[in-house]
Regions:
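Glycine-rich phosphate-binding loops of NTPases
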Residues: 91-156
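Extreme N-terminal "head/tail" segments of very large remodeling/mechanoenzyme assemblies
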Residues: 1-87, 93-99
Length: 157
C-alpha cells in the first residue's frame, strides 16, 4: 500500500507580460525568507501568493506591475508531484497545469480550468484542488458538539 504525504510547497511565483521581461521569485525547500529594503516588493509578493491561492482580486496596483497580465505559481506536493497555477492579473478562474512551467505554457499544453469560488456541488475549483493535495478534500469541520452536519472545510470563498 502506498502512503500519501499530504501537503505542498511553493516553488516559484512569476509575473509575465507581452512587452515585459519575466519577474520571478524562486522558493527553495524549507523556510524561505523574503527580505530587503523598504518599498522593494516584499509585501506585494506575499499579497500575490495569497491572490494565487484564491485571494480575492484585485491585486494591488503598483507601478512595477504595469505591463504584466498574468501570474504563474508553481506548487509541489511533498510526494514530488508538480503543478503550475495560471491566473490573469485581473483575477477570475485558474488554469491548472501538470508539471512546473517557469514560463507561460503554450496553447497546446493541456490544462484543467478551476473556478475561483469554492462549491460543495462542483469540485473543479481551486479550493477543492488545494484541499485534496493536503488530504482534506471532502472533510467537514466540527463547530460544536451538535451531531448534525457541519460546514464543509474550504481554503477560500
Amino acid at each position: 500500500m502506498t502512503t500519501v504525504t499530504p501537503g505542498l510547497r511553493l516553488r516559484f511565483l512569476g509575473f509575465f507580460g507581452p512587452q515585459k521581461p519575466p519577474a520571478t521569485v524562486t522558493f527553495g525547500t524549507g523556510l524561505n525568507v523574503i527580505y530587503g529594503a523598504s518599498n522593494t516588493g516584499k509585501s506585494f509578493i506575499v499579497e500575490a501568493i495569497d491572490f494565487m491561492l484564491g485571494g480575492k482580486p484585485p491585486l494591488r496596483d503598483i507601478p512595477e506591475r504595469v505591463g504584466y497580465d498574468l501570474v504563474l505559481l508553481g506548487l509541489e506536493t511533498l510526494d514530488g508531484k508538480s503543478f503550475t497555477l495560471w491566473r490573469s492579473i485581473d483575477g477570475g478562474g485558474f488554469r491548472l497545469y501538470e508539471d512546473l512551467h517557469q514560463t507561460p505554457p503554450t496553447n497546446e499544453i493541456p490544462y484543467t480550468q478551476l473556478d475561483e469560488k469554492h462549491s460543495d456541488k462542483n469540485n473543479t475549483n481551486l479550493s477543492s484542488f488545494l484541499l485534496d493535495l493536503c488530504s482534506l478534500g471532502g472533510c467537514h469541520e466540527r463547530c460544536n458538539s451538535d451531531p448534525h452536519p457541519t460546514p464543509e472545510i474550504r481554503s477560500r470563498g
